[in-house]
Amino acid sequence: MASNGAYPVLGPGVTVNPGTSLSVFTALPFATPAPGPAHRPPLVTAVVPPAGPLVLSAFPSTPLVAGQDGRGPSGAGASNVFVQMRTEVGPVKPPQAQTLILTQAPLVWQAPGTLCGGVMCPPPLLLAAAPGVPVTSAQVVGGTQACEGGWSHGLPLPPPPPAAQVAPIVSPGNARPWPQGAHGEGSLAPSQAKARPDDSCKPKSVYENFRLWQHYKPLARRHLPQSPDTEALSCFLIPVLRSLARRKPTMTLEEGLWQAMREWQHTSNFDRMIFYEMAEKFLEFEAEEEMQIQKSQWMKGPQSLPPPAPPRLEPRGPPAPEVVKQPVYLPSKDGPKAPTACLPPPRPQRPAETKAHLPPPRPQRPAETNAHLPPPRPQRPAETKVPEEIPPEVVQEYVDIMEELLGSHPGDTGEPEGQREKGKVEQPQEEDGITSDPGLLSYIDKLCSQEDFVTKVEAVIHPRFLEELLSPDPQMDFLALSQELEQEEGLTLAQLVEKRLLSLKEKGCGRAAPRHGTARLDSSPSEFAAGQEAAREVPDPQQRVSVETSPPQTAAQDPQGQGRVRTGMARSEDPAVLLGCQDSPRLKAVRPTSPPQDHRPTCPGLGTKDALGLPGESPVKESHGLAKGSSEETELPGMVYVVGSHHRLRPWRLSQSPVPSSGLLSPGGRGPQGALQSPSAQKRGLSPSPSPASKSKKRPLFGSPSPAEKTPHPGPGLRVSGEQSLAWGLGGPSQSQKRKGDPLASRRKKKRHCSQ
């Protein structure tokens, strides 16, 4: 009879009922899958009684497995196998058939294939499971291809025993309805009618479902080649195909798969989660099975590797490379066996998480199990290798951040310089408070080149600090200076100006008096009054000339005399004090050598023909110039104070400013005190006759062509500042040296006159 390449197996667990007369039947075992052509095992002969029921137990040794190339049963366990036999009692008569029922999982015959002889089989048939009920009726199960003579289609049949004639096994590969054969009204109805439906709904064991899942995976991959749902779909096929086989046993496998795929597409994701979880468990089983196989190989040694299937497991299964890929995302949950066998333990990752310098315990294991390691084992230490230490750049960056947060510097912690350089930490080097930033230095140079900026900076520099800084022997007491600056912070602007004015007058006049032999201008009212009396009693020769030539004009200016005296004193005090502070050679070196920007005096009496009183001019012009200068002088008392306080803050720029020259030269053109002392001389009724020393000086002053020589000698208290301003701003050094002896002689005479 025709067969599709797989045969039922009768193992040693066949149960027979003893009797007087025995029947003989022959069965063919299932052929195990092999890469080459299958070798057909020999036939097995069993003796059964002729009248009793024949019940064959389940196959305990080798379960039914799927055949190669989609042929053979794809379910685990045995199914309904119908065996025909004849008894040997009596003469030859129509055969008396008995049915043997084997009860286990349903047998699913797969896609069509070829016979051993090359003849195509009909489409497969899905058979339902049947309970183990003994069949006693003489039911004959036959087929259209059955014959009494033996196996058809070229299958060799060994010679039967002389007293028995074996009927062929009916192949379940016929998808057509079971026809009514020559042996009666046979069909599947008797066996299905006596089956209990409750037994068919019993849940199968997990192991059987796992084997079915392994067999369904190739079918699922064929329909979903590149989908991650292959394992879940294989789990979905287990109950669906089982239900379809119960509902319609004549349905082919292709039809069942098509309906199962349609059901899978209409299933929601929530309902699919059950099959995903089942697939996860099956993948874990597969991984554990593979690890057990590898463990058994390691125990036997790498020299003699056993066959890939263990003795207790089914030989037919997925290849090893397929299973190796599965444990990557589904690790085993069966205790400590899995990490030691295949999966890497999580312990080698702990050194990277906690401390890098701790050696991982993993490298010690290859030495202990060196003889049992598989070939891919030596590559795993390289995969789980972790860095032994943290990079020094990261450590140094962390140290820098912590030092910056804590406010400490590398030098404070005692860290050597070499370690800081090794950590590649560059810090700006500062020497004496000067940064080496080229951009900052260029910006400072640019600011210093601006005259307005320099002027503003000079205005805020403390004079004491500047004096000590520019002195040849700087001995500055920074503590005293800081205390003084703190005291000055609480003063108002007027108090601050007055304090600096008094200090500058004391220091400046103290330095100018021993050099030029002049009377010191103190802040005490007695000395200041004595200086004023000396100036009033000894008028200048030019003042006498102006008084004699134009008494009405000078008398007319008499009410303004007192104001002019105050203004002249205020204008003369500041330059005298500040010019006295210019004696140090450092200040002269700092003083710019450029010529004065504006020699035009603020008062019209300076530098004009009327004010200078050149020979040949009428007295009216002189008096007119005096009157004009005195009228403008009344408008300046407030401005002189402001300008004087401004110039106290920048003493070395007096030669460029027009204010000192306006303060030193009177508006009347007669010298610094010419316009100031002429009204006071008229008030007090001074004698118009000049002293002999003054008369002797009269001609050279009027005869010299330069304006500096036309200026008369000032009074005793202001003559030093007048000479210095003329020597710096208007005349050369030779002219100041030429007149140096004459003022000293006149001062001595005036001092003697005051003492008398």
Curated annotation (Swiss-Prot):
Residues 173-200, 293-438, 511-639, 653-756 are annotated as: Disordered. Residues 746-756 have a biased composition (Basic residues). Residues 304-321 have a biased composition (Pro residues). InterPro entries: NUT, NUT_N. Residues 417-427 have a biased composition (Basic and acidic residues). It comes from the Eukaryota. Pfam families: NUT. Residues 654-665 have a biased composition (Low complexity). Disulfide bonds: none annotated. Residues 543-560 have a biased composition (Polar residues). Belongs to the NUT family. This is NUT family member 2F. The gene is NUTM2F.
